[in-house]
């Protein structure tokens, strides 16, 4: 009987390398594919994609599997990066990694894998898929510190129908141990951090190449001018570092609480529990449920509003215009427009939506939040 073919997205990192190994052990016909999504040279003039592809080649040779490289730079620019820049222009804080999964890793890459006669595709994500009773469910990875369902939350059951997540049942330590036992060349390679196309580089320096900075005033909520900002796009709600206005007022740290786009003003408040940092709900659009529109119009669940945040109890109200009003059981700090609200039922990731508007807490409920 012909072996089932799996095309594995290999990044040069340890997770996807171990994923490829596990699939080969299970008897699949495994092909490794490296996706080049960004024409990338770091601050030292080194093309990190070239280094990563070298690691893919070395690991593939160690595992005895064929490998290819595919260039998705144009798709990435058109479908992910332009959105990222547009959102920043709107004063929002986008999450390009979620869109990269939806548009590149589970769309463009799937199309490419099918051209290689793949039965399945696989990645090194820490997530699990449950296929029972004709339904596909996306479940959190076994390692709570590494669970990546947040980034996969805009996928659909159709996306996931041909996907395998071989390391979803493992912890990061277990994955590293397997790589070390196999003497894989990248067994001790550190995890990549930051937005994929920025990597370890300075965010401000990177953005200057694409968006002209427009410095403006930093003001308190009372209207007092406290300093100048470098451009609203460089700041996010809840940010404390890099404001350059310490030592004023009560002496407590200052936090970004809002952006006034019209007047190019960054609004700040003092104290980590200032009421202006908290919200009681949000309005979201681009709602995507893994299994389509099967939820009731109003339902209770938990949610995350940023990666690795503790789950928050919420009630979701789907509105006739297709947006959602998400009501928080308790006020939540630093919820940010442009970010992704991801909904869960215990371990099951239900789907997600893009945060459009945050409903700020009024001062009377401040004590409950602090």
Swiss-Prot record:
GO terms for molecular function: ATP binding; tRNA binding; tRNA-uridine 2-sulfurtransferase activity. The active site is at residues 100, 196. GO terms for biological process: tRNA wobble position uridine thiolation. Coiled coil: none annotated. The record marks 125, 339 as: Interaction with tRNA. It comes from the Bacteria. It is an enzyme of class 2 (transferase). Signal peptide: none annotated. It catalyses: S-sulfanyl-L-cysteinyl-[protein] + uridine(34) in tRNA + AH2 + ATP = 2-thiouridine(34) in tRNA + L-cysteinyl-[protein] + A + AMP + diphosphate + H(+). Keywords: ATP-binding, Cytoplasm, Disulfide bond, Nucleotide-binding, RNA-binding, Transferase, tRNA processing, tRNA-binding. Its main location: cytoplasm. It is found in: Cytoplasm. ATP binds at residues 9-16, 35, 124. Its EC number is 2.8.1.13. Disulfide bonds join 100-196. PANTHER family: MITOCHONDRIAL TRNA-SPECIFIC 2-THIOURIDYLASE 1, TRNA 5-METHYLAMINOMETHYL-2-THIOURIDYLATE -METHYLTRANSFERASE. This is tRNA-specific 2-thiouridylase MnmA 1. It comes from Geobacillus kaustophilus (strain HTA426).
């Amino acid at each position: 009987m012909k072996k089932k073919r799996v095309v594995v997205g290999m990044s040069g990192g340890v997770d996807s390398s171990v994923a490829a190994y596990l699939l080969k052990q299970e008897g699949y016909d495994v092909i490794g594919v490296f996706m080049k999504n960004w024409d990338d040279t770091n601050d030292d003039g080194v093309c990190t994609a070239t280094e990563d592809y070298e690691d893919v080649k070395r690991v593939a040779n160690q595992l005895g599997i064929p490998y290819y490289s595919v260039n998705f730079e144009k798709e990435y620019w058109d479908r992910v990066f332009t959105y990222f820049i547009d959102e920043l222009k709107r004063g929002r804080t986008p999450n390009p990694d979620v869109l990269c999964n939806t548009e590149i890793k589970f769309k463009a890459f799937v199309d490419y894998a099918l051209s290689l006669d793949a039965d399945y595709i696989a990645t090194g994500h820490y997530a699990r898929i449950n296929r029972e009773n004709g339904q596909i469910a996306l479940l959190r990875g076994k390692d709570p510190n590494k669970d990546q369902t947040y980034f996969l939350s805009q996928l659909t059951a159709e996306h996931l129908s041909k996907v395998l997540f071989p390391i979803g049942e493992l912890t990061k330590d277990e994955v590293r141990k397997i790589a070390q036992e196999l003497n894989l060349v990248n067994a001790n390679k550190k995890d990549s951090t930051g937005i994929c196309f920025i990597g370890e580089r300075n965010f401000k320096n990177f953005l200057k190449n694409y968006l002209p900075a427009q410095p403006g005033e930093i003001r308190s909520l009372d209207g007092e001018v406290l300093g100048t900002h470098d451009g609203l796009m460089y700041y996010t709600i809840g940010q404390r570092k890099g404001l350059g206005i310490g030592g004023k007022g009560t002496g407590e740290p200052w936090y970004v609480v809002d952006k006034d786009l019209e007047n190019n003003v960054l609004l700040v408040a003092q104290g980590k529990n200032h009421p202006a940092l908290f919200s009681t709900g949000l309005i979201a659009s681009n709602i995507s449920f893994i299994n389509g529109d099967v939820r009731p119009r109003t339902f209770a669940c938990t949610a995350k509003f940023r990666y690795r945040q503790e789950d928050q109890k919420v009630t979701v109200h789907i509105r006739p215009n297709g947006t959602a009003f998400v009501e928080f059981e308790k006020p939540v700090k630093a919820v940010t427009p442009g970010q992704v609200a991801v909904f869960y039922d215990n371990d099951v990731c239900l789907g997600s939506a893009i945060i459009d508007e945050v409903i700020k807490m009024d001062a009377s409920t401040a004590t409950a939040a602090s």
